[in-house]
Every structure is written in C-alpha cells, then in structure tokens.
C-alpha cells in the first residue's frame, strides 16, 4: 500500500478524473517537486504543497488510482486542492501458475492454454472497468519470452525467477524451464549490439528537436519518413534540398521567430477567415501570398516571421493528412464529458453539419470548463498537439489530450483546431490556391513529389539566392521523387468519337480500361512501395507477391515508378474478373485466379525521370525494358488509333465484352500529374448517358449532408418492393443529380419522419442492414416519390437487401411524378435488369464518312441497306430480334458525333429522336433487312406510352413480346398488380375495366408505329 497525492483545480474538484499529479514517498521522504517544470514548491502544508503555474505535466488516466482517494484538503487562496488517501498502484509485474480450467487463451499465439499447463501472467491495469483494478494477460512460457525478446529495451523484463509471483508453487521442471528462458533472454540481450545512446530530446517553440546535453546528438531514423499515407525519401537530384531536413537545418524553421505574433494561432485564424470570405480564387491566393510575404503587420519592411512550412501545412489539412481516429460523434461524446454538458443536446446541434461550430457553441456555454480569456496558442504548439493526438487510440487518452489543449483555447481557437482534426478549414480553397501563393510552380512541383517540406525548402532556397543575386532567379523544377507517390494523371469523360478525334489531333493510343484498382509501383533496390489512386498504401494481400515478379519482369531496373492497374485474372480464360474481387475474402473464392499487374506507363527508371517524354517514347521504353510474365506482370492492351472507324470498333468490342471502357491518350502527350488530359470512354458517358443502366426506385429515407449541405437531407436511400416477402429492400444511397434549388424544394416536398438512425424506430416493412440506418424514414413507402436512378452499371453489394443488387455511381436523372410505387421497378424486375445488363449489348457504334477529315470509315459489317419505311408483314423473326435498330443517327446539335444505343433493357425516353444523315459521326448498326423485321427504321417511337399491360408468362413467345413492348415505352405489371393494368392479354377476370388485347395487337401497333384499337 502506497500513499498517493492527487492535485486538482478547485473548480474541477467534483470531477476526480480531471487533471491530476501523483507523488510517491520514498523511504518516508518526498521526491524533489522542482523536477516537474510546470510546478513549484511553496510553503509547507502537511509536509508537502504544490502551486500550479499552468497545467500538470503528468496526467494519470482514470482507473490508475485504486481505490479512489476520498479525503480532500484545501489550501486557502491557492489554485490547488490536495487529495490524500491510501491507494494501491498498478505496477507491471508477472505471476505464474497452472491453468485451472483451460479456458484462458494465450495473448500471443491466441490458442487456449490447456488445463494443468504452466503459464505466465502479466498483471496490467484493467481498461474495461471505470472503478479500476488489475487484470492478467496469460501466455505460454515460450510465448512470453518470445514477446519479451522482441520488446523494446525500456520494457520491463523477467530477470530472475523470484520476480514471478507464485514461483514457489512450481514443480522443479517448470522452474528449470523458466530459468533457462531467463538465461537465454539475458544472453541475447547482452549479445545485441548496443545502439548509440539516444539522449532525451526537447521540442523547441520553433518546432525543432534539440538535445539538452552538450555534444549529444539526436538520433533520427534513416528510413523514409512516413506521413499521410505515403513515404517521403531523399530525391536523387542534387539540386533539391533534402526531403526531410535534419533538425536545425530547416530553412523555414531557421527564419522563424517563435515569439513573433505571426506564429500565433490567432493570426492563422484571421488568415483563414479572410480567405473564406472572398469568393474569388485569385483573391484567395493573393491574401495568402501577402501574409507569407508581409506577415500579420502587412508591411514589406517587417516581412513574415513565422514558419512558412508549418503555415502552409496547416492551410492544407485535407491534403497533408494525419489520421486522428475521431469522427464527429466521437468528438461530440468526448467534449460533452469535458464540458460537462448533455451529449444529446450536442448531437442535435451536430445535425447542422458542422462539428466545429457545435463544439464552439457549447464551449462558450460551459460553466464548469470556460474558454480562455485570450488566445496565446502558437501554431507550433497546435502542430505538436496534432502530432501527439495522431498517436493516440484509446478514448481516455484522446479525451485527456483534447482537454489539455482546450484548457488553453478560446472558443474560436478550439473551433479552428477541430477543423484541423476534420481536415477541413472551410475556406473553399484547395492546394492549388494555397501553393500558388508560395510560388507559381509550387503546385506542379508538389503534385509530382507530394513532399511539401521539400517544395517549401526549395522555394525559400531560391528566394535566398535572389536576395544575394537579384538576376539569378530560377524556376522551381517539377520532378518525381522515388518512394514518394506522384499524383496520378487522370482522364476526363469523352461523350463522342468526334470529341476524341478533336482532342487528339496527333493520333491516340486506345487502351483497355480495366475494372480493377489503380496502383503506382515504386521500386528502389529491393524495397517496394505501392500506392493507390488516392496516394494511400495498398493493402498487402493485393500486392505482396509482386516483389517476386517485378525484378524478373524488369531485369535491368534498379529503381522505377510504374503506373498500373491491379485486378484478378482467370488463369483458364485469361480474362479479368469483375470489380471488387480483390477483397481478401472474395479473392479466396476464386482458387484458379491470380492477381495480375497490368502496366501501362513508366514515369521513372534508373534515376531518370520520364515524365517530360512523350507517351510514344515512354511506351517504347516500357516495351524495351519489360518482359511479360503471364498472368502476373503484363502490358495493358493498347492500340494506336488514327481513324474514327478504328475507335468505333474498339468501343463496340469493349462494351460487347463487358469491359469497363477505353482510355484514350495523345501519342505525344507528356505525363502531367493530377491533370485530366486523358480521355475515358464508358457506356454511361455515351450520348449523354443513354447507355447507362437505369431503374425507377422509391425514396425510402434520407441522411443529413455535410459541409454546405449540413442540416438538410441531401443523401437519399433508394429501394424497391419485394412482392414475395411484401417488404421493401434497399438498393443504393444516392447523393448526386440534384441542384441546390431542387434540394431546397425537396426539404419541403418529401414527407419524412426523423428517426436519427435509431434501430428501434426502423419500421417493420423495411428490410435494411445496420450500416444503412437513415436519419429520416418515409412514413408510408406506397406514397413516397419515385426517382429514375442512373449509374455506370448494376453491381453486387451484399450490404444492400435487394438480393445483393446495387447501382454503381448512382445519380438521380429524373423525378418520376408520373409513376407511383406500383409502376416503379420492383425486385423481380430489378433482377431481370441486372441480368440483362450483364448480357452482350444489342447495339453497335459506327463511324461516319471515310472521307471526313477527322473521321475514318467504319470497319464493322455493313450488309445490305436499310429496309423501307412501309409496314412489315408480321412479327420479327428470331434472327432479326437481336438487331433492334437499323440506321440511326443523332439529331440534336449537342449530341453530334455521339453514340445512340438501343439496349434491350433501356428504352428511349419520350421525345427522343435520332440524328439526320448529315451528322459527321453516325451511330447505329446496319444489318440486312428482312420482310419479317418490324419497322424500326431511324427511330424507336414511344408507341406504348401510358399503356400498362399484364402479359401472362405462359403467353407464347413471352420473352420477345415483353422485350419489344418495353422497348417501345410500355409498362408491364405483375399479376398481383393486375388491378392497375390498362390492357390485359388473355383473361381479364381480375380486372374487368382493362382492355383485352392479343399478341397480334402488339405487333400491329409496332408496325403502324401508333396505338390501334384492340384486336
């Protein structure tokens, strides 16, 4: 039993978990209090008293004092409360015994420790109890010593058998076994070469790390510094400053005066406010430029006395990211404890969408934890706090860190810090606007290297040279840095062949767009790094084996940066598997498949940057230096295109085979990081999305938006009806397609009930998984709105309950006021649409006149001529059923050169027409016309608009009838919904008001291109 003293603020004495400092007597003498830099010794009171200056340097978490001390002693007129009482301290110690029941598992190997087997326990504080207490972590003897062997040098180890509580009860065999392990551990520790002693370092106010002992050096790792999901390493070019300057050599830090007001968080906040208030991006850049040149005083004579790198870094929290493991609800939860306020009130205010504003409001209202009177925090202290917070994972530790910084903040200070944690300062400005204020080439240099500190140092170095020699100004070089991700070059949507030919007058490489995951591969000797499209490390199970094949594929490559795509490929067919199969569980389901790297570009090779080389040279270089390894490392399929007809053929092929699309690249184009100078062709882009997959879904619920859409419903839960279970299923969440005016109108028009994701308020009619519990729910789905949802394709998502069917990249393209829940897409129809979308598309893209200066002739099959416009003799034959269209051409000027498909599951919209013959790029499929072919020349009219037909599945030729009826804008109803039908084929006993028709009537309407009287 040890006597402990706990020091607290008087205003917080009621909350014993607040700031505390514990001192322990040694041989009835107190330790020197002066060793704590934030505390000082004063007049004695009961043997020991402390006077607080700022805050305690040691904060013990709740649960470490056991039991809680109860006696309080006050020192009148001071800022200190003294709490005394006996408490048992949890120390790191070990025990040993025999497993009693065989239920405990080894903490290291995770296997059960068999009953009667000797085990070693490590006594640790119990993190699961508010009242404190100890718990034991059990290990096998061998596992315990393996763990200690790999532990840090400062970790307490077992050095003698007597340190194990209960060792006296052991058998001799176990004693000998443990003694042998202790001896082995000691010998290995003695044999390990000792590193140079690392001296305790201190962080100065300028952010530099210095050694307190003269002559002692601060030991830094030579490995690349990992930050924000990527590694930063020294570039090989001697012109550049080191990527990670050694402490004390940073030009930015050396120019900084930590006591100047330019370093205050208050001035940083003012800068952010000025940038946010100005809508002009040029003005935003100028404001930041003036601050970095003139400082907070605004005079050139004074200049900027702050840390340029740190200021720019904090201005870009969404670009230079750290992970803090805190979401909005967790932040509210922690601050509700700190402010001692109602968490439900804070959660309600959070619905407005800005957690930083919520924290500011409740901080100002807090009586037990009021804000500081004046803002004295510096950005160096804020940066140190953020670095510390990023290392914390336990909730109590995070709360203590937030409480420490909040005690020194004004309300607006804390608001700014929360926004830094959330990676959004709400200035409506990106990296380009901030970095352009630093140097005209800073943004391009940053995109290429992603090393902000290196870019800032080079800018300051250039400015320093200009001061010495005004005529020697050099432009900032843009170059890649090995082992640091390069911002990938991107592609813009291409909606027509004509646009592609115009954008690439030199010719283009047409490349298969694989539906996998973009990966940037960095190799430096035997070290490999893999980065995703968002510059984050790729999961190891997707890329770990490539280190065995890349050296074989590039036998002469010591260092390189490759741009590539990773996907799973079937070893039997050689075809890629669908998107999403790279997941660790889904990949296991494909036993006969390999993860393959499709390489399409090389931007760095053996210390030479290739970004400035034209694509034709980079591609040739890649072929000269790479050897394909089948189904492991392969070239992406690429074809040089100079004629529109060749491009049309490739578009036909990729969509017919179910591939994602094409990427078109100018043969003379350089690699431009972050720029959308490539083109991508996908079926949902063609002809303004006419080829995209579409479904009419019901709005079932809604979610609060974020940022500018905070406090309003801006994300909507879409679903469909399942007639079998008579429940509603979720299909997708849709956030796109509505402009601001429409969103504002929907807030009033949509009838919603707020449930705040409460599971108890989820209605019984809704089949939904927990992750999609909405903030709002419709009271009656049969009265809810129906929207046309368009996406890139139908996809599989087990999280959704519509038989796992979802929509990829959904957007609302139309509010269907003309439809209700009965006429919306139901689950059986959705399944059919999904299956149809996976079938080969029933269309073709045909290029225009061969003599055209910008296009080439079609290389497709053009047999015969289009049939006459006269009526046909009968229903279509099976041979012609797949050719639903004859020569079709775009009509509107906006879609000249586009692609007009008539997929069998996506009928044309009312009012749509096809183009006149004069269009330079024609669309359609020319096939030999037959007498039996229905009249489909030039257009699929909306013949059956408004007709709701019940078509019994037993009807002869049911599938073809259904297909053509839907293609000409008819609506089919299910048997349970026959009451809503306007026409019935067969027996109309269940709906005597409907008109009775026959299959001949359907064909006759198609031939005459209008509704005729039922026959």
From Swiss-Prot:
UniProt-annotated binding residues for Mg(2+) 1: 565
Modified residues (Phosphoserine): 211, 217, 228, 244, 919
Reaction equations catalysed: ATP + (deoxyribonucleotide)n-3'-hydroxyl + 5'-phospho-(deoxyribonucleotide)m = (deoxyribonucleotide)n+m + AMP + diphosphate
Positions with biased composition (Polar residues): 234-253
Tissue specificity statement from the Swiss-Prot or TrEMBL entry: The alpha isoform is expressed in all tissues, while the beta isoform is expressed only in the testis.
Low complexity: compositionally biased ranges: 854-884
Metal-binding is among the record's keywords: yes
Record key words, sorted: ATP-binding, Cell cycle, Cell division, DNA damage, DNA recombination, DNA repair, DNA replication, Ligase, Magnesium, Metal-binding, Nucleotide-binding, Nucleus, Phosphoprotein, Zinc, Zinc-finger
Binding positions for Zn(2+) per the UniProt entry: 106, 109, 140, 143
Compartmental location: Nucleus
Zn finger spans (PARP-type): 94-186
UniProt cross-references to Pfam families, sorted A to Z: DNA_ligase_A_C (PF04679), DNA_ligase_A_M (PF01068), DNA_ligase_A_N (PF04675), LIG3_BRCT (PF16759), zf-PARP (PF00645)
Catalytic-site annotation from UniProt: 513 (n6-amp-lysine intermediate)
PROSITE patterns: BRCT, DNA_LIGASE_A1, DNA_LIGASE_A2, DNA_LIGASE_A3, ZF_PARP_1, ZF_PARP_2
Keyword match Amino-acid biosynthesis: no
GO cellular component: condensed nuclear chromosome; mitochondrion; synaptonemal complex
GO biological process terms, semicolon-separated: cell division; DNA biosynthetic process; DNA recombination; DNA replication; double-strand break repair via alternative nonhomologous end joining; double-strand break repair via nonhomologous end joining; mitochondrial DNA repair; mitochondrion organization
Needed co-factor(s): Mg(2+)
Subunit composition and interactions: Isoform 3 interacts (via BRCT domain) with the nuclear DNA-repair protein XRCC1. Interacts with POLG. Interacts with POLB.
UniProt remark on domains: The PARP-type zinc finger is required for DNA ligase activity.
Stated role: The alpha isoform interacts with DNA-repair protein XRCC1 and can correct defective DNA strand-break repair and sister chromatid exchange following treatment with ionizing radiation and alkylating agents. The beta isoform does not interact with XRCC1 and may be specifically involved in the completion of homologous recombination events that occur during meiotic prophase.
Name this polypeptide is given: DNA ligase 3
UniProt source species: Mus musculus (Mouse)
């Amino acid at each position: 039993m040890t006597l402990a003293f706990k020091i607290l603020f008087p205003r917080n004495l009621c909350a014993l978990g607040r700031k505390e400092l514990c001192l322990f007597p040694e041989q009835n003498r107190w330790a020197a209090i002066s060793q704590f830099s934030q505390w000082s010794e004063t007049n004695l009171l009961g043997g020991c008293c402390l006077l607080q200056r700022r805050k305690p340097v040691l904060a013990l978490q709740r649960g470490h004092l056991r039991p809680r001390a109860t006696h309080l002693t006050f020192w009148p007129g001071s800022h200190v409360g003294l709490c005394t009482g006996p408490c048992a301290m949890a120390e790191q110690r070990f025990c040993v015994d025999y497993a009693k029941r065989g239920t405990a598992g080894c903490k290291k190997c995770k296997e059960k420790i068999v009953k009667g087997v000797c085990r070693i326990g490590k006594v640790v504080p119990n993190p699961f109890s508010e009242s404190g207490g100890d718990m034991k972590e059990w290990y096998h003897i061998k596992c315990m010593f393996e763990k200690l062997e790999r532990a840090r040098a400062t970790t307490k180890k077992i050095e003698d058998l007597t340190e194990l509580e209960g060792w006296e009860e052991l058998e001799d065999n176990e004693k000998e076994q443990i003694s042998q392990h202790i001896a082995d551990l000691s010998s290995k520790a003695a044999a390990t070469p000792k590193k140079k002693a690392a001296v305790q370092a201190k962080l100065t106010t300028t952010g530099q790390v210095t050694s307190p002992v003269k002559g002692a050096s601060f030991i830094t790792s030579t490995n690349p510094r990992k930050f924000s999901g990527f590694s930063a390493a020294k570039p090989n070019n001697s012109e550049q400053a080191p990527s990670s300057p050694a402490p004390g050599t940073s030009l930015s830090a050396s120019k900084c005066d930590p006591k100047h007001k330019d370093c205050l968080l208050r001035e940083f906040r003012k800068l952010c406010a000025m940038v946010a208030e100005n809508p002009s991006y040029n003005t935003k850049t100028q404001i930041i430029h003036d601050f970095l040149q003139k400082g907070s005083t605004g005079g050139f004579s004074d200049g900027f006395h702050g840390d340029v790198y740190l200021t720019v870094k904090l201005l870009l929290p969404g670009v230079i990211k750290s992970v803090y493991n805190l979401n909005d609800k967790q932040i509210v939860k922690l601050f509700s404890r700190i402010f001692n306020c109602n968490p439900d009130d804070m959660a309600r205010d959070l619905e407005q969408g800005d957690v930083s504003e919520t924290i500011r409001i409740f901080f100002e209202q807090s009586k037990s934890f009021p804000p500081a009177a004046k803002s004295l925090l510096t950005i160096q202290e804020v940066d140190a706090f953020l670095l510390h917070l990023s290392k914390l994972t336990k909730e109590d530790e995070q709360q203590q860190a937030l409480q420490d910084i909040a005690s020194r903040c004004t309300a607006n200070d804390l608001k700014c810090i929360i926004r830094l944690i959330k990676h959004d300062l709400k200035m409506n400005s990106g990296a380009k606007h901030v970095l352009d204020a630093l140097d005209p080439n800073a943004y391009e240099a940053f995109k290429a290297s992603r090393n902000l500190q290196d870019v800032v140092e080079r800018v300051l170095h250039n400015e320093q040279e200009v001061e010495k020699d005004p005529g020697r100004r050099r432009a900032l070089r843009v170059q890649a840095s090995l082992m640091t991700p390069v911002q990938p070059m991107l592609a813009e949507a291409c909606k027509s062949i004509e646009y592609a030919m115009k954008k690439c007058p030199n010719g283009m490489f047409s490349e298969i767009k694989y539906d996998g995951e973009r990966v940037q591969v960095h190799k430096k000797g035997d070290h490999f790094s893999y980065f995703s499209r968002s510059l984050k490390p790729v999961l190891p199970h997707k890329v770990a084996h490539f280190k065995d094949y890349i050296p074989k594929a590039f036998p002469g490559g010591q260092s390189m940066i490759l741009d590539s795509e990773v996907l799973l490929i079937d070893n039997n067919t050689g075809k890629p598997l669908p998107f999403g199969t790279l997941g660790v569980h889904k990949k296991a389901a494909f036993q006969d498949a390999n993860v393959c790297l499709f390489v399409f570009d090389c931007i760095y090779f053996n210390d030479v940057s290739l970004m400035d080389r034209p694509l034709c040279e980079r591609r040739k270089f890649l072929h000269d230096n790479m050897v394909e390894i089948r189904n492991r490392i392969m070239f992406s399929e690429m074809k040089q295109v100079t004629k529109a007809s060749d491009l049309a053929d490739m578009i036909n092929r990729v969509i017919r085979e179910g591939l994602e699309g094409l990427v078109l690249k100018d043969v003379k184009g350089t690699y431009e990081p972050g720029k959308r100078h490539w083109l991508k062709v996908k079926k949902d882009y063609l002809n303004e999305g006419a080829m995209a997959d579409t479904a009419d879904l019901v709005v079932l619920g809604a979610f609060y938006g974020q940022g500018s859409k905070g406090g309003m419903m801006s994300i909507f839960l879409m679903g469909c009806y399942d007639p079998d279970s008579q429940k509603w299923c979720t299909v997708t969440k849709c956030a796109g397609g509505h402009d601001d005016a429409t969103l504002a109108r929907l807030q009033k028009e949509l009838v919603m009930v707020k449930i705040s994701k409460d599971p108890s308020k989820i209605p019984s009619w809704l089949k939904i998984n927990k992750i999609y519990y909405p903030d709002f729910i419709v009271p009656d789905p049969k009265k809810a709105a129906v929207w046309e949802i368009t996406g890139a394709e139908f996809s599989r998502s087990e999280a959704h309950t519509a038989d796992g069917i979802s929509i990829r990249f959904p957007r609302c393209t139309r509010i269907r006021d003309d439809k209700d829940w009965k006429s919306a897409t139901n689950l059986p129809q959705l399944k059919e649409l999904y299956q149809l979308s996976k079938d080969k598309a029933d269309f073709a893209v045909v290029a225009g006149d061969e003599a055209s200066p910008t296009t080439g002739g079609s290389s497709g099959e053009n047999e015969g001529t289009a049939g006459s416009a006269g009526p046909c003799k009968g229903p279509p034959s099976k041979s012609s059923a797949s050719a639903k269209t004859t020569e079709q051409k775009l009509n509107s000027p906006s879609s000249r050169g586009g692609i007009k498909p008539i997929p069998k599951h996506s009928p044309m919209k009312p009012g749509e027409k096809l183009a006149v013959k004069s269009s330079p790029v024609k669309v359609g499929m020319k096939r030999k016309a037959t007498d039996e072919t229905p009249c489909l020349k030039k257009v699929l009219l909306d013949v059956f608009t408004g007709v709701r037909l019940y078509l019994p599945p037993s009807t002869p030729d049911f599938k073809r009838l259904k297909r053509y009826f839907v293609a000409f804008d008819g609506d089919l109803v299910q048997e349970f919904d026959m009451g809503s039908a306007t026409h019935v084929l067969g027996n109309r006993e269940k709906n005597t008001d409907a008109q009775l028709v026959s299959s001949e009537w359907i064909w006759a309407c198609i031939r005459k291109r209008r509704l005729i009287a039922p026959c």
